[in-house]
């Protein structure tokens, strides 16, 4: 399928509406809940789905800002052509519903942690979204990002969580903003690593709060394992898009092409590490192999899709890799 086609295939509407990301986040959250034997409040599940959906919608709106829809892929073109409806109707409704869920259904401590993570997501969007306006957004965002980090340090959450989130925020500012505003710079920090990290932190936050309280360590083994999985998912997609001539300038193939060429080895190495975690789970897993087994199954499916990538378009590859994320969770939850 050409990148300039405007018709969205029936099987791709989930992606066009950005529903794949909240689905993946919620399913892996439920797997974590099963692994830790935690019964989540409905508001926590709905809240995660809503916030991930909102972030992805905003990201795609910003990516298409100031760009001719005919030059975008079908996913971003959909948002560019329906910008007003989405901006003035869909986004306010989603934000209002999310605020109601957050204020009425989520414990206060978790709400503050979510707010801290949301500020880091804003830094990420300022760093990597809005393709046509990244330079001036970098200048403005550097100061806004610093303010966000200072706000995180003042929130009523544990010092350990504060320091970890503030550290991630500072890293994102340095690698995301400051490297971009240098005119003519061709090497920055790829977005996949930070995007995968934020997605993993958001997915695991609710479980860690109920399992360990508001003093939870954000970068737990659960979060690190999911970080690796989600990052490899994003890098694989970027590699396929780059090979088709449709890659992003902030992706691994563009910034670190040497690493993109080693994707199969990266995937294999992390698969081996995860397999070891399944055989000999650390004490921090409490002897529960459920999460590493689900991650291992997903990695194996990713490897299978990668082998047949030459038969895929960038869009169909996205769909298949998202299925590689979804199917193991369904297996765990139904078994």
Residue map of PLM features:
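Hydrophobic alpha-helical transmembrane segments
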Residues: 2-5, 9-55, 69-70, 88-124, ...
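Short juxtamembrane and helix-loop transition motifs at transmembrane-helix boundaries
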Residues: 5-11, 70-82, 99-106, 129-132, ...
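C-terminal ends of transmembrane helices
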Residues: 56-69, 122-133, 174-191, 234-246, ...
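Solvent-exposed interhelical
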Residues: 56-92, 227-269
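Cytoplasm-facing juxtamembrane segments at the starts of transmembrane helices
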Residues: 134-141, 186-197, 255-263
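Interfacial loop-to-transmembrane junctions
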Residues: 140-143, 250-262, 300-328
């Amino acid at each position: 399928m050409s990148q300039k086609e405007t018709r969205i295939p029936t099987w791709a509407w989930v992606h066009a509406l950005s529903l794949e990301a909240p689905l993946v986040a919620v399913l892996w959250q439920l797997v974590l809940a099963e692994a830790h034997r935690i019964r989540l409040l409905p508001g926590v599940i709905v809240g995660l789905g809503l916030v991930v959906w909102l972030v992805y919608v905003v990201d795609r709106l910003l990516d298409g800002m100031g760009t001719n829809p005919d030059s975008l892929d079908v996913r971003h073109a959909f948002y560019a052509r329906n910008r007003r409806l989405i901006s003035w109707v869909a986004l306010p409704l989603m934000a209002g519903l999310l605020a109601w869920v957050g204020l009425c259904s989520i414990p206060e401590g978790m709400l503050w942690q979510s707010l801290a993570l949301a500020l880091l997501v804003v830094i990420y969007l300022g760093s990597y979204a809005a393709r046509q306006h990244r330079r001036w957004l970098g200048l403005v965002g550097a100061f806004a990002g610093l303010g966000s980090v200072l706000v995180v340090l003042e929130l009523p959450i544990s010092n350990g969580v504060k320091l970890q989130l503030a550290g991630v925020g500072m890293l994102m500012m340095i690698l995301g903003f400051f490297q971009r505003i240098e005119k003519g710079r061709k090497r920055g920090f790829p977005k996949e690593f930070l995007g995968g990290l934020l997605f993993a932190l958001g997915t695991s936050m609710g479980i860690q709060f109920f399992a360990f309280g508001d003093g939870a360590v954000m970068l737990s083994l659960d979060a690190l394992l999911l970080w690796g999985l989600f990052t490899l998912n994003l890098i694989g997609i970027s590699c396929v898009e780059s090979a088709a001539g449709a890659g992003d300038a902030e992706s691994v193939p563009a910034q670190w092409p040497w690493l993109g060429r080693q994707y199969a080895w990266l995937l294999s190495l992390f698969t081996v590490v995860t397999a070891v975690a399944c055989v000999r789970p650390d004490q921090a897993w409490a002897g529960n192999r459920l999460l590493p087994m689900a991650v291992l199954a997903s990695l194996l499916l990713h490897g299978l899709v990668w082998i047949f990538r030459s038969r895929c378009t960038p869009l169909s590859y996205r769909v298949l890799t998202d299925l590689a994320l979804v199917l193991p969770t369904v297996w765990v939850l139904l078994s």
